[in-house]
Amino acid sequence: MSKISFDAQSISNSLRAAKHQPRKRFGQNFLHDRSVIREIVESIRLERDDNLIEIGPGMGALTEPLLAEVDAMTVVELDRDLADSLRIRIGANSHPNFTIIKDNAMHVDYRELYSEERGKLRVVGNLPYNISTPILFHLLSYADVIEDMHFMLQKEVVERITADVGSKTYGRLSVIMQYHCHTDYLLTVPRGAFNPPPKVTSAVFRLTPHIIKPVVAEDEEYFALVVRETFNHRRKTLRAIFKKSTLLPTLSEDDFAACAIDPQARPETLNVKDFVNLSNQARTIPV
């Protein structure tokens, strides 16, 4: 790995040199802790020919050590000042296979970055915490061309994504993400690893899209509706939720039995397969 020159002072100096103030609306908190950067890069386990995409590179604290591990890399940066700074520092003159896309990560067609020659995408990034969930769901729509994703988010959100069934943090995000991907909690990142420090502790996690889903919902939009509606009333029993919801049908004892689910159970006790079976059964019944 190449020498990592980022620390709190160098980040501050770079921001001043670029006349750039971290923008709250972009959720800009710049990573500078060398040991954390090293841990993140090592956890990704890159190969030279990987089709690497970084979302929100910021000042390039992760970008440069990542680029040292691969032959080519694409970054997506909405902030034009930061994109221009990256282009000057590590652009075409120093690395001809470094591409910058100046755009909102939510507007990028990631399928265009895939090719049989370059392979599936390996996506990394320190996502803006204020819009992280929409970005994750946007990326899931390209799961068939993504090998894996490594992201840094608020620790509490990562705990929800990777939660085990029955735990306090298990919920809608756990079920939806684990339906589409295998999830791994990798490491915790303290507030002091950033400049300026965020208000919360962060964590890094991995999403690996299922090549073949272990269970398949007949209607994924309806599956998502069932998951959302049930967790909106997580303290109630499933029987009560389906009886009172205006969006879901009332289920009979036979309906629950067909899913092998106890109608007295609560949402946090159901695994992904249970939710799939429940949604497949419920969608056949008029509301």
UniProtKB/Swiss-Prot annotation:
Keyword field: Cytoplasm, Methyltransferase, RNA-binding, rRNA processing, S-adenosyl-L-methionine, Transferase
MF terms (GO), sorted A to Z: 16S rRNA (adenine(1518)-N(6)/adenine(1519)-N(6))-dimethyltransferase activity; RNA binding
InterPro entries (alphabetical): KsgA/Erm (IPR001737), rRNA_Ade_diMease-like_C (IPR023165), rRNA_Ade_Mease_Trfase_CS (IPR020596), rRNA_Ade_methylase_Trfase_N (IPR020598), rRNA_adenine_dimethylase (IPR011530), SAM-dependent_MTases_sf (IPR029063)
EC number: 2.1.1.182
Predominant location category: cytoplasm
Catalysed reaction equations from the record: adenosine(1518)/adenosine(1519) in 16S rRNA + 4 S-adenosyl-L-methionine = N(6)-dimethyladenosine(1518)/N(6)-dimethyladenosine(1519) in 16S rRNA + 4 S-adenosyl-L-homocysteine + 4 H(+)
Function as written in the Swiss-Prot or TrEMBL entry: Specifically dimethylates two adjacent adenosines (A1518 and A1519) in the loop of a conserved hairpin near the 3'-end of 16S rRNA in the 30S particle. May play a critical role in biogenesis of 30S subunits.
UniProt-recorded name of the protein: Ribosomal RNA small subunit methyltransferase A
Lineage per the UniProt record: Bacteria, Pseudomonadati, Pseudomonadota, Gammaproteobacteria, Moraxellales
Gene name as annotated: rsmA
